[in-house]
Amino acid sequence: MAERKLLEALNGRTVFPPPIWLMRQAGRYLPEYRETRKKAGSFLDLCYNPELAVEVTLQPIRRFGFDAAILFSDILVIPHALGRDLRFEEGAGPLMSPIQANEIPGLDPNLIHNRLQPVYETVRRLRSELSEETALIGFCGAPWTVATYMIAGRGTPDQAPARLFGYRHPKEFSELLDTISAASADYLIRQIDEGADAVQIFDSWAGILDETSFDQWCLRPVAEIVRRVRERHPNVPIIGFPKGAGWLYSRYRQQTGVTALGLDWTVPLSEASRLQAEGPVQGNLDPMRLVAGGQALSKGVEDILSALGGAPFIFNLGHGITPETPIGHVEAMIQQVREGRL
């Protein structure tokens, strides 16, 4: 069997035109997703219903033929599986009770699998339904980003509650990160056991930290996840996405040991090319260029292909696709990437 295109790139081979998939490619910009979401009831019900989660994962594959499917789930299923309450409210996003320092020792990463069984079933079904050419990506949130929601109880603009908690309660915060790391590593291992070809670690709030905190709260826990996953699955590629890491991207790769770097759209292409000399990169089109379409889109795609297409590379956005993105713009982008038009 020929190797899946995404895996070729992740294993260090230059593929042109490059493989393409999009973060949040199963989402509200698709009418078929919105219909399935209505059937599910709540967002969490959708995540935990294997039949519907498989359906929404496959929808962008059927429509666009991306080179990879990414499991439909959410990074916050880990705190939910650790016993924290979780709900999603329209317009407010995820909400949970803020965790207190004295509650952290009671979290047991060994208890997550009962609640996450439906997710593992989704992965198993997806691998059986996807074509041989289409890779399946599993994922988790990075411990720092997951912890920010557990401490604040919701998303906040600058993650001040989590930063303050970490400074005031360093011992308890380190314990929380260790617990999330252990749970996340086991979660990824199980996804790989069920058929995931590669995994991605999303650290959406990595860019909010100072250098010392980045080392302690971002690098150290992710390195532990990578170590544990590699013990069980040494050859499965791991993509790290520390959004906003700026000049610390290179340190992130070196100290965590991830296979590939996901780059956000603020990384200059000259710097992306330098990072690519160290290993595969993924990214990094500004999602607003995809919303805008036209010359803004075609120029963005052209610049990225020209700068990064000559070495191991996966075309993606620099963050998730937004709900207002026109489907026609996605189709135009895919066509330009697949034609390799510079």
UniProtKB/Swiss-Prot annotation:
One of its GO terms (molecular function) is uroporphyrinogen decarboxylase activity. Pathway: Porphyrin-containing compound metabolism; protoporphyrin-IX biosynthesis; coproporphyrinogen-III from 5-aminolevulinate: step 4/4. Disulfide bonds: none annotated. The record marks D74 as: Transition state stabilizer. Its EC number is 4.1.1.37. GO terms for cellular component: cytosol. GO terms for biological process: protoporphyrinogen IX biosynthetic process from glutamate. It is an enzyme of class 4 (lyase). It catalyses: uroporphyrinogen III + 4 H(+) = coproporphyrinogen III + 4 CO2. Keywords: Cytoplasm, Decarboxylase, Lyase, Porphyrin biosynthesis. InterPro entries: UROD/MetE-like_sf, Uroporphyrinogen_deCO2ase_HemE, Uroporphyrinogen_deCOase. It is found in: Cytoplasm. Substrate binds at R24, Q25, A26, G27, R28, D74, Y149, S204, H319. Homodimer. Belongs to the uroporphyrinogen decarboxylase family. Catalyzes the decarboxylation of four acetate groups of uroporphyrinogen-III to yield coproporphyrinogen-III. This is Uroporphyrinogen decarboxylase. It comes from Chelativorans sp. (strain BNC1). The gene is hemE.
